[in-house]
Swiss-Prot record:
Matching Pfam families: Homeodomain
Primary location recorded for the protein, binned into one broad class: nucleus
Highest taxon of source: Eukaryota
Organism: Danio rerio (Zebrafish)
PROSITE patterns named in the record: HOMEOBOX_1, HOMEOBOX_2
Descriptive protein name: Homeobox protein Hox-D13a
Gene behind this protein: hoxd13a
Transmembrane segments: none
Keyword terms of this UniProt record: Developmental protein, DNA-binding, Homeobox, Nucleus, Transcription, Transcription regulation
Family from the record: Belongs to the Abd-B homeobox family.
InterPro entries: AP_axis_regulatory_Homeobox (IPR051003), HD (IPR001356), Homeobox_CS (IPR017970), Homeodomain-like_sf (IPR009057)
Length: 256
């Protein structure tokens, strides 16, 4: 079995394992860059992602997978210029083993985990906006990571974000059309009832019964309440207040 046939078989069996690396598998020869080519790869680093079929021969083949911390880079390995980036720009000189190891550790994965670290929102999450929209860069301020939320850029930025006329006004709580009588009635319903003075006829009947007995009975209370158009509670309260008033006047108590 040659290398090209083995590559096609790998792509057909494991299409998800190759992804964007399928373009490298058309030539039939192994294609790996200096950074992607490890010197020794163990089975534990590849097994979480896919397994090899049983009919693989000794021919050459190309595959794409994620490597874990189990790869090893020799001490004397030297990477050519342009393979790795340093501070956002291509390096003009070869990169030694120490610098490459520090960069590779930043993009390493947990051993035995099939996915990478969760993405943390930071400054790089903000998309690039035109200079005319952002204004002068000297007046821009740095954004912190705390409370950062991804902005939905699917909508057009030129559309109006806020319109005062679209806002619905809240209904007025106080209506000026209410009359003073309605306001007074509502206040009396919520709080204490308005005091209504007794009429002369009511006071005459109450005083006559009080002169007869200072403690009214149940039958007399019902009779006076029905004759004076008062409630039994009002009659009882009037007798209580009348007795308190007599106690405050000593001369009346002596005569009694």
């Amino acid at each position: 079995m040659d290398g090209g046939g083995l590559d096609e078989e790998f792509i057909n069996v494991y299409p998800s394992a190759f992804g964007t690396h399928s373009s490298r598998c058309t030539s039939g020869a192994p294609v790996l860059s200096a950074v992607d080519r490890p010197t020794s790869v163990c089975n534990e680093s590849i097994s979480p992602y896919f397994s090899f079929p049983s009919n693989i021969g000794s021919g050459s083949f190309t595959f794409g997978c994620h490597l874990e911390n189990s790869y090893k880079v020799p001490q004397n390995a030297v990477f050519p210029p342009g393979v790795a980036k340093q501070n956002g720009q291509f390096a003009n000189k070869p990169v030694d083993h120490g610098e490459a190891s520090s960069w590779l550790k930043e993009f390493a994965f947990y051993q035995g985990c099939a996915r990478s670290y969760p993405r943390i929102p930071a400054f790089i999450d903000l998309p690039v906006v035109q200079r005319a929209m952002m204004g002068d860069l000297r007046h821009e301020t740095c954004l912190t990571m705390e409370g950062h939320q991804h902005w939905d850029w699917s909508n057009n930025c030129s559309s109006q974000l806020y319109c005062f006329q679209d806002q619905t006004r809240s209904p007025h709580i106080w209506k000026p059309s209410l009359t003073e009588e309605a306001a007074a009635a509502s206040f009396c319903q919520r709080g204490r009832k308005k005091r209504v003075p007794y009429t002369k006829f009511q006071l005459k009947e109450l005083e006559r019964e009080y002169n007869t007995t200072k403690f009214i009975t149940k039958e007399n209370r019902r009779r006076i309440a029905s004759s004076t158009n008062l409630s039994e509670r009002q009659v009882t309260i009037w007798f209580q207040n009348r007795r308190v008033k007599d106690k405050k006047r000593p001369d009346v108590c002596i005569k009694c």
